[in-house]
Amino acid sequence: MINRRGKIKMETVYIAGGCLWGVQHFFDTVPGVQMTEAGRANGTTSSLDGPYDGYAECVKVVYDEKDTSISELMAHLFEIIDPYSLNKQGVDVGKKYRTGLYSTDPRHLEEARAFINGREDRDKIMLEVLPLTNYVRSAEEHQHHLERHPEDCSYCHIPDAVLNLSLIHI
């Protein structure tokens, strides 16, 4: 989108794909992605403290829509998740590890749903596509964690070949 001053406006979506460390690291390497931030989507509070509030671990992805699209971001997401798994990616189990795409822009949600509906396996896919109702930035220790602590890659659900390739590109 172009804003009123004729400058390119970046688009923002929130992508959940299990543990956010690997998801953030992977999306940092995707062409067209300008910035990522680890966070929590659609919980009921604005706090990082206290009991679990229904959030999904997610990565805020800011991208240039002339360089990539929601469909392309979804295709990349499907490279690193098991789309048939509900509330589980790799060894990480629980509702906070569910997969999803969240946005405040209905166009993003429509394109994500169209991507899923265009797949032959659409009836088996457990990824949720919902409006973003709340976002909380994760603590600094979780921001770009694998870049600072590559020894933690062994905890990640993303296949080694994919994760190692993204390590090379950083």
Show which residues each predicted segment covers:
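Flexible coil/turn and secondary-structure edge motifs
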Residues: I2-I168
